């Protein structure tokens, strides 16, 4: 049975992981930054050394394309992920999917395999969304879900315009996003959660992806003295915010619920120890893999906020920041993942992706699925992020099988 070169793949993961380390030892490659350029340059070099045609589109998505003779007009199989990172990141998130994809192509080429269609390795721009919003921007533009000009005009957290930054680092591209129309997309990725490791399973066949609803909620009460204002007379914006958070947790704990909810950002005004908050501003991240259930959670929150205004004598306004519907991946490709795992005697289970991924955007335009490998202790977006070498190789070998079967058709 054909297998990837584990040593080469691991060496590349570590080499790319060494790019963007600052003086404090923190790994950060924000989209379109100098550090991102250095990572792109390295991956581009590896693509060229593998004999691939390297192309960048106008949003900065980077492609390495293998086009065997006679199939240039055939829709390609596409595989990859992203190489931009969060601040103080691990070395596997996204990078594993890009480098596993490159390893798959090199292995297939060396084996004498002749695909019936091109195979394209891709590193999408700004998946993390740390510097530029929204996240998964490169794949979203590629799939036609966001206007190119609007994306290029996006202003980053540092005031830099994305289009200008892509030009500055030399990755503004020469072709329009969507120039390749894939017949299928497969993304290998670390799980970024604890399920596979906890259950002792090597491969996750990802069958769907949670819908995501982001809101910013502003609660206005009455700023007042913490010592002289009796509880009954208070319009405490801080307390009202806390009630919203506990309400969301209670929804997650309902029997059979698949909802998860997070308040990741919060600010009180005036933010003083002896002053009742007159204002609270916080974010809400609600996720569920079922479209109807996600809508139900959004409505339940809206109803609760309406009631809370009355009971706590506060004014509440909401702002939608982002919303992505749940995604159901292609059953045929999910089965290919399961079949490959079985053929290689690897334990496997079907899974839901709890995180947003580039694959959810590609699912808009072609059959798509994902392959998960275990994350040690479920840790990600953290320098402690780790996937064991054997699992790295196992996931890449499953990707090898799936890509080969899709490209042979």
Cite the ranges covered by each PLM segment.
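Alpha-helical metal-binding/catalytic segments enriched in His/Glu/Asp
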Residues: 79, 88-128, 213-219, 225-251, ...
């Amino acid at each position: 049975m054909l297998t990837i070169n584990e040593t080469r793949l691991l060496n590349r993961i570590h080499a790319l992981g060494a790019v963007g380390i600052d003086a404090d030892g923190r790994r950060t490659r924000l989209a379109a930054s100098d550090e991102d350029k250095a990572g792109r340059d390295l991956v581009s070099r590896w693509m060229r050394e593998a004999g691939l045609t390297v192309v960048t589109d106008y949003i900065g998505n980077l492609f390495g394309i293998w086009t065997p003779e006679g199939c240039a007009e055939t829709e390609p199989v596409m595989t990859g992920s992203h190489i931009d990172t969060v601040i103080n990141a691990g070395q596997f998130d996204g990078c594993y999917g890009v480098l596993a994809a490159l390893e798959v192509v090199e292995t297939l080429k060396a084996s004498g395999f002749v695909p019936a269609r091109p195979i394209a390795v891709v590193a999408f721009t700004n998946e993390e969304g740390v510097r530029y919003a929204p996240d998964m921007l490169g794949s979203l533009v590629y799939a036609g879900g966001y206007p190119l000009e609007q994306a290029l005009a996006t202003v980053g957290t540092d005031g830099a315009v994305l289009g200008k930054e892509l030009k500055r680092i030399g990755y503004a591209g020469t072709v329009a996003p969507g120039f390749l129309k894939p017949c299928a997309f497969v993304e290998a990725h670390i799980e970024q959660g604890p399920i596979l490791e906890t259950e002792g399973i090597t491969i996750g066949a990802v069958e769907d992806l949670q819908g995501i609803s982001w809101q910013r909620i502003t609660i206005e009460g009455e700023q007042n003295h913490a010592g002289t204002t009796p509880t009954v007379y208070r319009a405490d914006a801080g307390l009202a915010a806390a009630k919203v958070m506990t309400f969301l947790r209670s929804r997650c704990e309902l029997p059979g619920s698949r909802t998860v909810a997070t308040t990741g950002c919060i600010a009180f005004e005036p933010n003083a120890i002896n002053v009742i908050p007159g204002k609270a501003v916080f974010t809400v991240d609600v996720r569920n893999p079922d479209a109807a259930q996600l809508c139900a959670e959004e409505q339940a929150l809206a109803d609760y906020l309406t009631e809370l205004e009355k009971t706590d004598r506060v004014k509440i306004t909401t702002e939608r920041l982002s919303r992505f519907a749940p995604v159901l991946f292609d059953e045929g490709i999910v089965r290919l993942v399961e079949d490959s795992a079985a053929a290689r005697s690897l334990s496997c289970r079907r899974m839901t992706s709890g995180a947003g991924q580039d694959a959810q955007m590609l699912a808009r335009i072609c059959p798509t699925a994902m392959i998960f490998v275990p994350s040690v202790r479920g840790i990600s977006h953290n320098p402690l992020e780790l996937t064991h070498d054997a699992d790295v190789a196992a996931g890449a070998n499953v990707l090898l099988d799936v890509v080969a079967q899709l490209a042979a058709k």
